[in-house]
Structures are given as C-alpha cells and as structure tokens.
Amino acid sequence: MKPLVSPGLAKACTGLSLIGIVFLLVLSYLFSIEAETLMHDLVGSGLTGKQVAKTCLGAVVIYAVFFLFCGSQVIVSRYQKPVRI
C-alpha cells in the first residue's frame, strides 16, 4: 500500500491534530463547568455552556478522524520499501 501524503506532511498533520484534540477537550471541559471567563462572551447569544461543550466535542471527533488517518499514513510510509532503480 502506498501512502497518500508525504511522511513529513503526515507527521505534521498528526501532531497538529493531537494538539487540536487536547485544546478542544480542555475548552469543552471549561464550557461544561461554565467557567466565568468564557461564559461572559455567550451573554445575549442564547447559547449555554453545555451546548458549546457539545460542539467542541463534535470538533474533537473530526480531529480524531484526521489523527487516525494521518497516523496511519505515518505507519504506512515507515514500512514502505524504498524504490530501487
């Protein structure tokens, strides 16, 4: 099986996806406990902290899919035999 993206791009995508997952999980937790620092931005919007936390978790799922795809590309490129001419 050939990788779809280069190894460098796959590693960068994997790293950024992991950072995004961690960041969004922290934001989701803070919105779910309705941290005062974040909640004042929601005043007048009609949104609750729980709704925003669910949205953050939805984004975590998307980032997790990218993490799995890019991580699989790193593994595939690691085991690919070099082309010999």
From Swiss-Prot:
It is a multi-pass membrane protein. Keywords: Endoplasmic reticulum, Membrane, Transmembrane, Transmembrane helix. Its main location: endoplasmic reticulum. GO terms for biological process: vacuolar acidification; vacuolar transport. GO terms for molecular function: RNA endonuclease activity. Signal peptide: none annotated. The chain crosses the membrane at residues 13-33, 56-76. It is found in: Endoplasmic reticulum membrane. GO terms for cellular component: endoplasmic reticulum; endoplasmic reticulum membrane; vacuolar proton-transporting V-type ATPase, V0 domain. V-ATPase is a heteromultimeric enzyme composed of a peripheral catalytic V1 complex (components A to H) attached to an integral membrane V0 proton pore complex (components: a, c, c', c'', d, e, f and VOA1). Accessory component of the V0 complex of vacuolar(H+)-ATPase (V-ATPase), a multisubunit enzyme composed of a peripheral complex (V1) that hydrolyzes ATP and a membrane integral complex (V0) that translocates protons. V-ATPase is responsible for acidifying and maintaining the pH of intracellular compartments. This is V-type proton ATPase subunit f. It comes from Schizosaccharomyces pombe (strain 972 / ATCC 24843).
